Regions:
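Acidic beta-strand-loop-alpha-helix segment within the catalytic core
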Residues: 103-190, 234-245
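Short glycine/threonine-rich catalytic loop with a Thr-x-Gly-x-Asp
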Residues: 91-94, 182-187, 206
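N-terminal subdomain of lithium-sensitive/metallo-dependent phosphomonoesterases centered on the IMPase/IPPase/PAP
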Residues: 1-85
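Oxyanion/phosphate-interacting regions
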Residues: 1-14, 18-19, 167-175, 188-245
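Residue-level signal for inorganic ion chemistry
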Residues: 17, 21, 44, 55, ...
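Short, Asp-centered acidic motifs that coordinate Mg2+ and/or phosphate
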Residues: 62, 112, 151, 199-200
Length: 245
């Protein structure tokens, strides 16, 4: 595998998609499907189409996209994972916390990650053989060791059970931290940890395309990432930390 070549492929694809999402906001911010707490926009579909078209012309690896999907049988040991618009609900409401997220996965382990925050024009990258960077400048996780001084970033999955027991567990966990943030984008949450803005991002019942790129970037920044309970439909639990807390 040519790590450098594939990082460049992901970077170009992410920038193309991000530019389109920003430049054509009014025409792309059109609801295609709204189901419960989930929403799909024209932006999701058009962004994924653009990314898949570019990557397919540059790489032979199969692609797992959030919108188009793939079954386990269609994928190989190495495959791309694409979230064309992470933070769709934020994008829909004009909240500038969303990103394009692209990863290359080998044996279910993210080896390359690229996240493009098109709202701030910040491109984050990292791999198993390179340092984590933001716009070509090195980034590192924080050195905070205590939750009482740290920031937790988390989210409430679309399918979460809001019963009393689950909510009490959530509250008990929150109380240990100095600050807790819910920002509506797994990609942005993970780069907050990778760049030292937060110490832990954790979420249950999220998906591989939400976190794969962030896992690669955070590890390259000196952090620790654990994917657990990965299912056949690519749902999973995630914990991304500064490796100290």
């Amino acid at each position: 595998m040519d790590i450098i070549k594939n990082i460049e492929i992901a970077k170009v694809a992410a920038r193309l998609a991000g530019k389109n999402l920003k430049d054509n906001y009014n025409s792309l911010n059109v609801t295609q499907l709204e189901e419960g707490r989930d929403i799909k926009l024209k932006a999701d579909l058009e962004s994924e189409k653009l990314i898949i078209e570019y990557i397919s012309n540059e790489s032979d690896y199969p692609i797992l996209g959030e919108e188009t999907g793939k079954s386990n049988l269609d994928l190989e040991d190495i495959f791309w994972v694409v979230d064309p618009l992470d933070g769709t609900a934020n994008y829909n409401r004009g909240i500038p916390i969303s990103a394009v997220s692209i990863a290359l996965v080998e044996n279910n382990n993210p080896v390359i990650g690229v996240i493009y925050d098109f709202n701030t024009d910040e491109l984050y990258e990292g791999s198993v053989s390179s340092k984590a960077m933001m716009n070509d400048k090195p980034i590192f996780v924080s050195d905070i060791k205590d939750k009482s001084r740290g920031t937790l970033v988390t989210g409430l999955p679309v399918a979460m059970n809001y019963d009393e027991k689950n909510m009490q567990t959530l509250i008990n966990n929150f109380q240990a931290w100095k600050k807790v943030r819910m920002i509506g984008s797994a990609a942005i949450a993970s780069i907050y940890v990778a760049s030292g803005k937060a110490e832990l991002y954790t979420e249950s019942g999220t998906n591989l395309w939400d976190v794969a790129a962030g896992v690669a970037i955070c590890r390259a920044a000196g952090g620790h990432a654990v994917i657990s309970n990965l299912s056949n439909d690519f749902s999973l639990d995630i914990e991304i930390s500064n490796n100290l807390i």
